[in-house]
Amino acid sequence: MSILSILKKDTNIDMQENNINDLVASASRVIAPLWPISTFAAHHPWMGLEKQSFEQVADWLKEIRNVDIYPSAAMIHSAKAKGEIEESFLQSGLSRWLDSQSFHIPRKKVEQFCQVALKLEELPSSLLSLPEVNKLAEEMSYINTESMKDSSLQPVSSLIENQKGENLSDILNYHIIKWCKLYLDDSGSSWTMPNREKGFYRAWQHLIKFDPALSKNERKVLKDWPQDAQVALARALSELGISESNIQAYLEGHLLSLPGWAGMIRWRSQQSIQEQELLIEYLAVRISMELAITKPYLPLKNQKVEKKVAIVPLIASWIYWGNISTREWLQMPAAEQSELLVFAYRFDENIRRKLWLEAWEQTHAEQLRKKIASKQRATNDKKRVLAQLAFCIDVRSEPFRRHLEKLGPFETFGIAGFFGLPIATSELGSNNNHPSLPVILKPKHQIKELTNENELKSYEQRKRVGSSVRYTFKTMKQNVLTSMALPELSGPLFGLQMVTRSFVPRGVGAFIRNLRKTMLQKPDTTFSLNHVHDTKGEIPIGFTKEEKVNYVRQALKMVGLTEKFAPLVVMCGHSSQSTNNPYAAALECGACGGAAGGFNARVFATLCNLPEVREALAAEGIKIPEDTIFAAAEHKTTVDELEWIYVPELSEAAQEAFDCIESIMPNVSQHANRERLTQLPNFKTKIKNASKEAHRFAEDWSEIRPEWGLARNASFIIGQRELTQDCDLEGRAFLHNYDWKQDESGDILANIIAGPGTVAQWINLQYYASTVAPHYYGSGNKTTQTVTAGLGVMQGNASDLLPGLPWQSVMQSDSETYHSPLRLLIVIQAPIEYIERLLNNDFTFREKVQNGWVRLASVDPEGRWKNW
């Protein structure tokens, strides 16, 4: 029997086949996929809403969830006090907004009203409760405010309170969180959810009849419930009285009730064919349970919540901000009163904060323009370059690169930290692949780390010792009997660890790190670089010759490194180092799901050293000198050190460059660490040894903020290094090298925007969302978080799965933000026609710019700046 016939028989909803699938797919736009915390990937929560403008989404979220996504008044006042907002930009923004409005009030009068309102002061409660003001509002009941009313469809459970005064939506959330934890748990418990292999809905349906948390009547509602999730969802919607035209909005409301758990469900549904309908199953479980809980209260008279316009605040705003007395108000004609009310309604809090945000962003853009203009130099005035080093575009690379260039004859480049290699990596002794590329891409090749058989056996034996200890501990912890004895057995050891880790973290950390290196010292390894035709896996192993040449050519052209090679070229991945930190993966590559970049850097450098690759590139005009050697290193962002991971046999000139880098690296680390550490809240005084302090932060397991990560990111600059060289960009800019003269077709620029540009935007808006709405898009305080089911963090044991960054990643103190919530400014160094072509050809990017999700500026070959 088809779903269509079941729906027609059991419900009043006349749907087409697969309509439920389409509605769920459309509704899912309001949530973003949430990666597990162990493979934390930057994402922004509004990625599915970019067809609407930022302003529209802000108004919509304020209406349906009461979530503000503009900076608060406190943030704005703080930024203005620091000189981050110029008043002139605010005034010009206000003038443009007033020009766009239609009103019949003297311009001077509305300007005076707006100027005072833009101080962002709250209306006094004494004024709002004043009898005269409330009487005025009552007497104006004849004013037509229908055009100003809002109505939104809310989940039925959110409209009902039980006899205990509990909102039924809170009770529903409690149940759903419980079932999500049971189904999604991959590592937390030894007893998994029965029938889990049959899917979320079927497993839930099997157990719900035994759930003691439900009443007998609630279980009775679900007793003979449909076996199919789609049918169950349609039936529940029908019995709740949701009309077909309102279904998508209703589903969106439920997805936004727990956006973290729903986001994790959505991510899981994208990972395998077996779980591709998991989001439908989630909604079937949730709305079926909603029906069971709310059944005694049905039917409701009205499921749409009408938000009538409050007249009192509108009148009070004109009295307080417009300097109109109650007597003057009474003497006005009704038409004028109505006009004033409508204007006050339009110039609401969102508009006021929007104007401040835009002024803040314009001030930042102007300050960046001046900084770049003051440092521009002739591109032909170049010093002798001893080594060239390519770093990830990550904002944390910028200070390190700046100090490196100051202290030695080096040239640095910015490139996406996976170096254009779409690979899944398999480290020595591992049977699992880990995608080592941005999460917006899928791996096309599998690269295995290899060594000889004897070395491999020895290494695997050493690994098994550590694995068996961890496995034994986990088994004892999860076993009913042994878990009671475990605290007594392990207490002394963990007590000693706690004391030493807290009071001598650097020394203990170094000891443990050295012990681990000794025990798990890798032998010399190679890679499976050559293509294997017959492979059992879905992803082919290695590269063909053409693929090797293509990936190297593509990366070198992307950064404009096709001539004038230095004797030593170093590909620098990056990684982080912290202890007792659930968000450790978030401090790795923000794009690559917690993957460090060292593996890719080593693979790329190895490819560049292959004679067959160099010969093919030389035939195309990219001639790499014979004495130029490619090496690989890893930039440790928490301690600002460079760790060599691949140094082949060096030529004489390359050895000189290598020795020079080694000699200045301690100074580079000291300068970079000092600059970075002084930004932390606990370091306002002079630091004697910055590198030692950085290591202490990395090893101290009580440290809640080992580094700032990518906080304060604000711009993505695409251009030659000369554009920003010697500029102190304060670790706020993503830097990607680009030479427009080598990109006649514009394809390289298009690829940078589609790949690294998208990733930078995701990172930027994740930090933005976690700052402006931490209660909804952040993850609260690290010190009170609970790591749940190996998936993510919760506050306590019954909260949403928290989707964003913790308080410590964006806040300097309880009252002071560290991250400046600005939308990403993309600056492209290229002629105007290149930008026009990009916008004409890339509809998605043009939409982001037009709808206010990113900002765009360009610098032409003559150094002229243009805001788009």
Curated annotation (Swiss-Prot):
Annotated source species: Bacillus cereus (strain G9842)
Pfam families on file: DabA (PF10070)
Q: What is its quaternary makeup? A: Forms a complex with DabB.
Keyword match Zinc: yes
- Cofactor(s) this protein requires: Zn(2+)
Q: Where does Zn(2+) bind?
A: C392, D394, H574, C589
Membrane topology category: Peripheral membrane protein
Is Zinc among the key words of this record?
yes
According to its UniProt entry, what is the function of this protein?
A: Part of an energy-coupled inorganic carbon pump.
Q: Name one GO molecular function term.
A: zinc ion binding
> What is the protein's given name?
Probable inorganic carbon transporter subunit DabA
Q: Please give the family membership noted in the entry.
A: Belongs to the inorganic carbon transporter (TC 9.A.2) DabA family.
Q: Which gene encodes it?
A: dabA
Location relative to the cell: Cell membrane
The record's annotation in PANTHER family points to: INORGANIC CARBON TRANSPORTER SUBUNIT DABA-RELATED, UPF0753 PROTEIN AQ_863
Superkingdom field: Bacteria
Provide this UniProt record's keywords sorted from A to Z.
Answer: Cell membrane, Membrane, Metal-binding, Transport, Zinc
Q: Which GO terms describe its cellular component?
A: plasma membrane
Concerning InterPro entries, the annotation shows: DabA
Principal subcellular localisation of the protein: membrane
